């Protein structure tokens, strides 16, 4: 019983510290597009409804389009496969949005198989290698960025973060739920490597 009394507060403190660390985000200026530049922007996939990117995914896509329009990246690599019931895969829906926004087709790359963040990055790394691209800007939500960068680092990717400057997770409850989810998945990554 004494051990449990000591372990429980320590675990609560640990989880709280990890949650804070995730919430603060990576050290490399998340959300600041002013100083990022790379061969390619990797847009991590998110939900699609039918053929329409979710609001969260639209934020990521729009951020990548802005970086490409500013000349900070030459290519955009959209990641994400097709979920059951969707008309388009995540990367396909993102590509359609980018083309509609005027991004040249030759500047767009896709990978269509992944369903997790780690798969997004592993498959993106293969696409980059095939296209002769060496370094990347990884685009995701601010609270997702820490885990994404930990994964990219574990793969040996030359990458820097650029979190979306806005997020759809605005209310305290939405942020708390997403942060709890990210804290869980960060531990899952540390324990299982995915």
Residue ranges and their predicted role:
Residues 1-32:
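N-terminal type II signal-anchor transmembrane helix
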Residues 21-180:
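A structural signal for short, hydrophobic/glycine-enriched beta-strand patches
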Residues 172-194:
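A transmembrane-helix-recognition feature enriched in membrane-embedded lipid enzymes
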């Amino acid at each position: 019983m004494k051990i449990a009394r000591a372990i429980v507060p320590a675990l609560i403190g640990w989880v709280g510290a990890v949650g804070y660390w995730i919430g603060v985000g990576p050290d490399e200026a998340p959300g600041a597009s002013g100083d990022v530049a790379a061969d390619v922007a990797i847009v991590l996939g998110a939900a699609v409804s039918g053929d329409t990117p979710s609001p969260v995914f639209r934020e990521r896509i729009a951020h990548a389009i802005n970086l490409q329009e500013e000349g900070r990246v030459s290519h955009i690599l959209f990641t994400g496969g097709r979920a059951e019931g969707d008309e388009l895969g995540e990367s396909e829906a993102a590509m359609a949005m980018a083309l509609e926004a005027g991004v040249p087709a030759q500047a767009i790359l896709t990978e269509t198989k992944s369903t997790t963040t780690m798969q997004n990055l592993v498959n993106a790394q293969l696409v980059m290698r095939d296209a002769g691209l060496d370094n990347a800007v990884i685009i995701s939500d601010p609270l997702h960025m820490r885990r994404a960068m930990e994964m990219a680092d574990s793969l040996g990717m030359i990458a820097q973060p650029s979190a979306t400057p806005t997020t759809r997770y605005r209310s305290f409850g939405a942020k708390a739920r997403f942060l709890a989810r990210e804290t869980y998945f960060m531990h899952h990554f540390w324990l299982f490597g995915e």
